[in-house]
């Protein structure tokens, strides 16, 4: 089972233009085996709001994608940050501090026994989490 990093969610949005390895990888998996972190929801929401400020039309398209596709697709499979995740995340910052968002995604994966699917493998090095790069799968 996998937790999708934000870059994988965005790649899967590219209808007809999704990298073939990512598309084939995702098609082989049952949707019930794919999860996202509330951190990815945060990152997507920030991106939508920033784009909407400069391009209302594109902002509306992204808002519709988020509300009609991402959230319904992952309904019941958006993993929250709870006490166990927060405590595990803290251990990932010592002795080497890292990005809070990446550490929270890694901690969520560790607590729930998931593999992180990401293009940014280096962001998750030395966390102890299993990582898969779907672009190379």
Name the predicted role of every residue range.
Residues 46-51, 72-119:
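Active-site neighborhoods of divalent-metal-dependent phosphate/nucleic-acid chemistry enzymes
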Residues 1-39, 50-67, 137:
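Short, well-structured N-terminal submotif of metal-dependent ribonuclease cores
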Residues 38-39, 82, 120, 135:
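Residues at the C-termini of beta-strands that transition into short coil/loop
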Residues 5, 43, 102, 120-123:
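Acidic active-site catalytic centers that drive phospho-/nucleotidyl reactions
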Residues 9, 41-44, 86, 124:
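A generic structural signal for short hydrophobic patches within well-formed alpha-helices
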Residues 29-32, 73, 112, 127:
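Structured helix-beta-strand junction loops
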Residues 1, 106, 110-137:
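Acidic, PIN/NYN-like endoribonuclease modules and their adjacent C-terminal/linker elements
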Residues 11-13, 47, 88-89, 127, ...:
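Residues that scaffold the ATP/ADP-binding catalytic core of kinase and kinase-like folds
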């Amino acid at each position: 089972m996998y937790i999708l990093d934000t870059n994988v969610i965005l790649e899967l949005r590219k209808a007809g233009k999704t990298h073939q390895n990512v598309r084939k990888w995702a098609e082989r998996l049952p949707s019930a085996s794919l999860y996202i972190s509330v951190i990815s929801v945060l990152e997507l929401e920030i991106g939508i709001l920033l784009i909407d400020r400069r391009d209302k039309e594109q902002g509306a398209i992204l808002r519709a994608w988020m509300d009609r596709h991402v959230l319904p697709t992952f309904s019941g499979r958006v993993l929250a940050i709870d006490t166990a995740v927060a405590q595990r995340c803290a251990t990932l910052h010592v002795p080497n501090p890292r990005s809070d968002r990446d550490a929270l995604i890694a901690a969520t994966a560790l607590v729930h026994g998931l593999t992180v699917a990401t293009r940014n493998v280096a962001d998750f090095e030395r966390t102890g989490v299993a990582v898969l790069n779907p672009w190379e799968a």
